[in-house]
Structure formats: C-alpha cells, structure tokens
Amino acid sequence: MFKYTLDNKRYHTLNYYNKTKYGCKVFKVSLNAGFSCPNKKNGTGCIYCYNGSGENDGMDLLTQFNKVRDNTLKKWPNAKYIRYFQAGTNTYADVNTLKSKYEPILKLDNVIGLNIATRCDALNSNVLDYLEDLNNRTDLIVELGLQTIHESTSILINRGHTLEQFEEAVLELRKRNINVVVHIINGLPFETKEMMLNTIKYLNKLDIQGIKIHMLFILKDTPILNLYNTTNFHILSKEEYIDIVIDQLELLRPEIVIHRITGDPIKELLIEPTWLLKKFSVLDDIDKEMVKRDSYQGKRIQ
C-alpha cells in the first residue's frame, strides 16, 4: 500500500497532506489581487495565457474571501482556509504593495496558510526577505511556473526566463525554508513524451515540496491558437495524457505533494482538448490505470 494515502490513492495528494497536517477540512480560496506580469511588460506574455479579466477581477480581497467562506461554513463549520493569490504574478510589486495585499488577509479567523503564485524573475532580495518574514508567521507556499526544462520550448512559448533563473529562485526560497510548488505543462507544442519525462526527472532532483501537473489547453484569443491553426501540432489524447502522467508520478519522490494533476479550462473559451472538461473522469481514469499497472508514485526511482 502507498504510504501517503488515506483513500487508496496511489500518489501523494494535497488532500492527504492537508488532512494529516491540519486534521480538518481545508479550503484553498483563490484570490485575484490585480497583479500584472513582467512577461507582459514588453511583449505578449506566454503564448497560452488568456489576457481577459480573471475571476473576481476588480472585487476587493475581503469580499472575494468571504464569498467562498460563507458558502462553506454551513456544511463545514470547523473548516480552515488557505489564501491562494493565483491570478497574475503575485510578487510583481514593491514590498509595501505586497504588504497591503497580504497582511489584511492574514488576520482573518481560521486562515492557516498563504499560497503565492509567481515567477522566478519577480523575486528580488527585498521580496524574498518579506516572504521569509511571512513564512515565520504563517504556512507559506510559493508556486513557480516552470512548464518545461527545454530551451527550445521555452523560447517557443515565450516563457521569458531561463532555467538558471528558475534554479536560483528555488535555492533562494529554500535557503529561507519556504516551501516551493512547481507548475509544469504536458503537451506543449512539439514536445515528446521523453521530453516531458525529463522535466520530471530534473525536478525530482531539486529541493521542491510539491508539483502541479497541467495539460496544455488552447483558449480563444490566445497566441497559441494561431500557432495551432498554422502548424496543427499534436494535442494529447486523454489516453496519452494519462499514460504520461502515470510515468511521471513513478519518477517522483513519494514525499512530493501532487497539488494538481489536470486542468480546469474555461468552458466558453476552450478550443482543445475538449476531454479536459470532464475533469473527474480524467482523475478516475488515472486512478484505474494506476491500479491496473500496479503503479504508484516513486515506483521507478532507483
């Protein structure tokens, strides 16, 4: 039986991590603080990124938080909450601006942690020192978008930073004992299965605490749609995606927490792949295939 499970999952789920650490139901509340992105300053940003207004765009942070909390209190009166600054690059500002966004939320009842999604090129020394201070006062996770280790793909998708910058950011965060979660994307244009597995092998050697695995999806009004229309690059089928994800899980240390294993595209904007709209079917099929293969996270680590 896989060590890190309470429900027969064969990978280390975020649900397991939260239940064993906090002993109660934990909700992650996604917040939009209105941050921009350095990669959009002088260009279009990453080619798969949709530039429309994000969820809760323009709504103050306290209202955003209460909207979710009020919907959960009746069923889970003892629940705890993690604030997730998700939209944009959430350290792309001076420290005083960051404090104005983060500090009021820290004071709310039953808030036990803070997740900050950002980029490795938006972590200067002042920001890093402030994050260290936050980490001493709450359970802090910093999420970094890597997507791929391959330079050719990085240039194609206009990621806007180098692998060396990413490594340096991980080192600086870990020097401050800040937990790091890394985002990767499977199915990026022209990447092979071997390339996707090599991204996981690289991450498995780093001092990271979690990972989010996404499937590339193509949305309306994004530059990647133009690339898809002109090159017709291969979009992974559900079966191909599941096969790759399971192989990736087998190459990951069991203690690395899997925060996400598929995506949540906006239905009205999605062009491809439409199978992503059936999220729970994808998750169920991953579980079934892992049982069929007698697979589990870390199985192939020597």
Which ranges hold each PLM region?
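Acidic (Asp/Glu)-rich catalytic clusters
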Residues: T72-W76, Y102-D109, D129-D139, L171-K175, ...
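Auxiliary Fe-S-binding modules of radical SAM enzymes
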Residues: F2-Y16, Y22-F27, G210, I218-Q302
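Generic structural signal for well-ordered alpha-helices
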Residues: F65-D70, K99-E103, L128-E132, F166-V170, ...
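Core AdoMet radical
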Residues: G52-V68, T72-V95, N110-L123, D139-Q165, ...
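Structural recognition of alpha->loop->beta junctions
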Residues: C46, L106-V111, N198-I213, V282-Q297
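N-terminal [4Fe-4S]-dependent radical SAM core
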Residues: M1-I82
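Distinct, well-ordered alpha-helical segments
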Residues: V95-E103, N124-N135, I157, M196
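Conserved C-terminal portion of the radical SAM core fold
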Residues: E164-P223, E239-T262
